[in-house]
Amino acid sequence: MVKISMKELLEAGVHFGHQTKRWNPKMKPYIFGARNGIYIVDLQKTVRMFRTACEFVSDVVANGGSVLFVGTKKQAREAVYEEANRAEAYYVHNRWLGGMLTNFQTIKKGIDRLNYLNEIKLNETINLFPKKERLKLEKERVKLDANLGGIRTMTKLPSVIFIIDPKNEAIAVREAKRLNIPTVAVVDTNCDPDDIDYVIPGNDDAIRAIRLLTSRIAEAVVQGKQIAAERRAAEQDKAADDKAQEQAAAEAAKPEPAAPAPAAEAAEEAPAEEGPIIEVIKKSGSEEDGEAAN
């Protein structure tokens, strides 16, 4: 199970919220107090809610689900890119395109185009195009990769979306809610937590805080994949054992081969085979007796 401590949260500055004049009253249950005009997040609740969120993410992935990391603000881009890649998860870290979820079939056409451009660059068939056309295609590829590179292998909608700053990613939150896709988000004191399924109260502006929380969610994804792999291995072993048992049962059900003929029967047949030889001997004996008589 993924763990996080109060000490780690404090050192990363997760407890620092926004200025008291820039807050959302709906975040009041998660606020410990205020200091020097800045709200302080209740880290005890953060630890508890973060653990719940990690368990949820791990369970979803263990059951074959996928996670999409979303963080397009400057402070979050690097952490989202690196941690999502480490967990081999999908990500959007530059710009959220409207309809990325609700109009996925159209987005999928862009993904297919990107994959095609990547392929012709990799196998160098792009060099067969005129220079002007090559430059145009490369420019198109770079633009598509910036927006769709993190989801280029995504063939269907994700099972969960992890978001840094739901206020900044309001479009992504709305699309996920419309499609009933669960959301896990780092929610600061200026955000509305109502549209988030798994709230993680904390600082969504500090780079260290974002890095810490994102890395632990990535660990939950990795853990879920390990559990899924172990389950598949166990199922394969069980299937192999069942097959071996079926084969053993089939062998046991086969009829036994017929027993060899008793020795007595062989003895009864022997005189019949020796008959001609005995007749020859008798005949020879008769001839010898005749000669002796003469």
Curated annotation (Swiss-Prot):
<feature type="region of interest" description="Disordered">
    <location>
        <begin position="232"/>
        <end position="294"/>
    </location>
</feature>
<dbReference type="InterPro" id="IPR005706">
    <property type="entry name" value="Ribosomal_uS2_bac/mit/plastid"/>
</dbReference>
<comment type="similarity">
    <text>Belongs to the universal ribosomal protein uS2 family.</text>
</comment>
<feature type="compositionally biased region" description="Basic and acidic residues">
    <location>
        <begin position="232"/>
        <end position="245"/>
    </location>
</feature>
<dbReference type="Pfam" id="PF00318">
    <property type="entry name" value="Ribosomal_S2"/>
</dbReference>
<keyword id="KW-0689">Ribosomal protein</keyword>
<dbReference type="InterPro" id="IPR018130">
    <property type="entry name" value="Ribosomal_uS2_CS"/>
</dbReference>
<dbReference type="GO" id="GO:0003735">
    <property type="term" value="F:structural constituent of ribosome"/>
</dbReference>
<dbReference type="InterPro" id="IPR001865">
    <property type="entry name" value="Ribosomal_uS2"/>
</dbReference>
<dbReference type="GO" id="GO:0006412">
    <property type="term" value="P:translation"/>
</dbReference>
<dbReference type="GO" id="GO:0022627">
    <property type="term" value="C:cytosolic small ribosomal subunit"/>
</dbReference>
<feature type="compositionally biased region" description="Low complexity">
    <location>
        <begin position="246"/>
        <end position="265"/>
    </location>
</feature>
<keyword id="KW-0687">Ribonucleoprotein</keyword>
<protein>
    <recommendedName>
        <fullName>Small ribosomal subunit protein uS2</fullName>
    </recommendedName>
</protein>
<dbReference type="InterPro" id="IPR023591">
    <property type="entry name" value="Ribosomal_uS2_flav_dom_sf"/>
</dbReference>
